[in-house]
Amino acid sequence: MEMQWRRLRERLASEQCQDDSVEIDKNECQFFYRLWRCLNDPHAGQADRLHGYYDALQCAHAHGLLPLRLPLKELISTPELARAGLCRNRDYPGEILLDEKALQIAPDLLSVWRNDKRRMLQAPPLDNLLPTLLHDVKYTHYTSVGQQLAVRTVLTSQKDRFLFINLPTGAGKTFIIHSLMLAASPGQLTLVIVPTISLAIEQAHRAQEVFQQAGVDHGGEYAWHSGQSAEERNALKERIKAGEQRLLFCSPEAASSGSLLLLLFSLAKRKLIEALVVDEAHLIDQWGAEFRPEFQLLAPLVKSLVEVAQASIRTVLLSATWSQSTLNTLKELFAGDCPQAIVEVNGSFLRPEPMWYVHKAKDKNDYQLQVEAAIQTLPRPLILYVTTVEDALSWHQYLRTSGYQRSGLIHGKTSPKQRAKQIADWADDNLDIMVATSAFGVGMDKNNVRSVLHVAVPENIDRLYQESGRGGRDGFASVAQIIYRPDQIALARRLNRDNLIGAKKGFLRWQKMHLNRESEGKGRFSVYLATKHDSIKIDSRANIAWNWRTLLLLQRAGFLSLHFSAPDLEQFASNQQSEDAVDRYFNHYFSHIQIELHRDGHLDKQVWNGTLRQLRSQELQTRQKGFLVLEEWLNHQDKPLCGMLETFYTLDGYVPELACGGCPGCREKALPPYSPTLGLIAHAISDEEHGRIGRDIRVYYPSARSSALLLRQWNDWIARLLVNRDIHAIRASQTVLAQLSQQLFKGVPFWCALSPEDATTRWDELVIVMPGERLPDLDPFSDIKRIIVAPETLLEQNVRGRLWWESDPRARSLDQFIRSLSSGHHK
C-alpha cells in the first residue's frame, strides 16, 4: 500500500499525469486506481475528479499513510474544494488535504476505505472427482459448507427432484451450475434461465472459461439472446439438435420464444434435457406477476417438458434471498402436486459486509441537503436506488449538472441497447455512480461496489436487503444507507399492496375465461389469457397480467394446475418453417394456457367470497409483513437490524448464521461489527426415506496384495455401485480417494469424497479400509446404508481376538459380494 501511495503521489506531481501506462494496482487499492482512471478519463467531470481525490485521501488516512496530501495542479476555487471535503495545504499550495470535517468522519466508516475483510468463510476441500473434471489448479476448495452441501445434493439427487438452494451472495451459486454441467451425461443439455440478457451473456462467458480449462468447450456460444447474428443462431441450433451444446443460458423471454421452445420440446422428446436451473429464482414470485409475466411461465413449462419426455428433469432453483412466503409460493408452483419431490438446501448467513445507516429528513429541503451530502462523501463505486422512473431521471440530471459525469442511469424504461452499454461501462469501472430502480443489479457480478444509497423507502425489508447486498460482494466492508422523507412511507405502503387480485374482480375474470374455454382432452381445457370481462374494453398487457394473477390465485388455493400443451413438433419436422412462422405459431401458443381442475367451487361466488378472499387476505398479510418489518426498523432504530433480519430470513425453522457489519441498534449498544467465520452450518431437508437403522453390509477381502493393485482390480465393481446409484459417497483415506478419482472411467456419476473422520452425511456410502488402516468410527445409529469393505484379518475394535466381520451373520467375502451385484441381491 505504501508503494502504491508513493507511486500515485509521484505521478500526480509529474508532468505526465495523463499516462495510461502507469500501473496503479486495482487489486491493492481500488481507490487509488479509481482516481487514476478519473484523471485519465476525458469524459470525467470536476466533481468526479475531486471525489477521486477524496476517496484516495480517505484511504490513505485509514491506512495511516504519510504525507496525507496529494498534488493537484488544477486551479479550483476554495468553495469547490470545500464541497468535496478538501482544502489547499498552506505550506504546499500545490497539494490538497482532507478538510477538518472530512478528518472527523465516523471512525467505523474508515473500515470501508481501509478495505477491512468482513466475510470469512469455512472452505472445505472439493470432492475428489471435481478437480478431475475441472482441470484447473485454482479450484481446490468449496467456498463454504453450504456450497459443498448444495453441490453434493444437486449432483446426487434423483432426476425427479425440485431443489431449492438458498446460498448467500458470494457463497458460490454459479459453481453449482458449472458442476452440474461437467458431471452431466454426454449429449444432455442443462438449461439455465437468468433474469436478464446481459446476465445470460456474462454467465455464458464465465462458463466458457471454465469449460475451456476443462477441455470440453465446443468453441461456440453458450447464451441464446436477440443480439446474435443469423449465423451464430443457426450454429447454436445445430449444436442443440446434435446434443453438443451441453449448457445454455437464456432469459425467461427467450425460453418462452418459439424458436428455442421448439428445440427444448424436441430435446425433451429425445430425453436429452439433464436439468433446468433458474438463477435468482425469487424473482419468479416478485417480478412474475408484475412486469415480467414470462417468469410465471417457467413452472408450467417444466411440467410440459416432463410430460413430453415421459421422464424426469431435475429442476434447480437458486437464490440468495428466499423469504418464507416466496419459498412457499414457488414450492406450490413447481411441485404442488408432488411435495415429496422437494429438496431444500439452506446454507444461509447474514451478510457481514454492509454497515447500515438511516436518516429521516425533516422536510423536502432537509432531504435534498442530506442526499447531496451523502453523494459528496460516500465511497465509490456507489449505487443510488430510487423507487420511480421520474426520481431516477431527476437524480441523474442533478448528478450530471453537479459535475458527476461518470454517472449512469438504468430504470424499467431504459432501452436494451442503452442498458447493455451502461452495464458494460459499470462493469469496466468507467462509471462511479449508478442511479437505478430495482430492475438494476440482479445477478450483476460487480464485486467492488462500496456504497448503496437508498433515497426512497423500498416496499419491504426484503428489497432493501437485496439491493443493499449489491455492495461488498468481494467480502470487504461496504456502506448501506437510507435517507427518506415521511411522505415516502405512504408510497412504499401502496407499492407493497399493489398487484394482488381481489375476490370480486378475480371472480369476474375467471368466470369469463372459463365461459370461453376450449376442451383439450385428457380432462383439460385451455383459456385465452387476453380474455376481457364485460367491464374491460381495451386489450393490454396489464389485462393479461391480471388474468395471470387470477389463475395463480386459483392454483395456490388448490382449485387447478396450469400446463402448456406440447407443440406440434411434426409441423416443424421438415425444418422449412421460417423463424417468423415459428414465432407466429408460438405467439398464439402462449396466448393460451391449459388448465386441469382439481376441486369444485371455482364458479361459486360464496367460495370466492370465503375461501379465496381468506387466502388473498393471508397473502396480503404475508406481503405486508415485509413492509411492517421495515417500517418498525425505521421507527425504532434502537432495535438491532441484524436480529430482525435473522428472524425474517428464517426458513422452515432454520435460522441463518448471524453476522452484522454494524447497524444503528448495535452501535447504540456500543457493539462492534460481528464478522465470525461463516458458512459453517448448512441443512438439507427432504422427504426422502432411508432404510432402517443398521443397514451396514460388511465385506471382507484377503489383503495379500498392495493397496494400489487392489484398487485397480476393484475399479469395475465400485463403478457399478455408483452407476446403479447404490452409493453416493465413498469414505476412505485421501490416497485412496485421489486414486479412485483418477482411475474411475469418465461418465461415472458424481460421488461425495469423505475422509474417515468426517461426520456421517445423508448419503449412502462405500467405506474402504485398506491393509494397514483401522476401521473408522462409524455412527451405529445412522439410517443410511453403508457397504464396509475391509481386510479379512482386521480385528474388531475393543473386542479382543475377534475379527471385525465375525459378529455379523450377513457378512460376506468380496467375491460373494461382487457376484451378488449381478443378481441384485447385495441390497
PLM features: residue spans?
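Generic beta-sheet signal
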Residues: 193, 301, 318, 455, ...
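C-terminal EAL-domain catalytic cores of bacterial cyclic di-GMP phosphodiesterases
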Residues: 786, 791, 800-802
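Short acidic low-complexity segments
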Residues: 436-438, 750-761
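N-terminal helicase ATP-binding lobe
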Residues: 1-351, 363-380, 389, 393-406, ...
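Long, charge-rich boundary regions
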Residues: 641, 673-740
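C-terminal helicase lobe
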Residues: 374-393, 397-412, 418-438, 444-685, ...
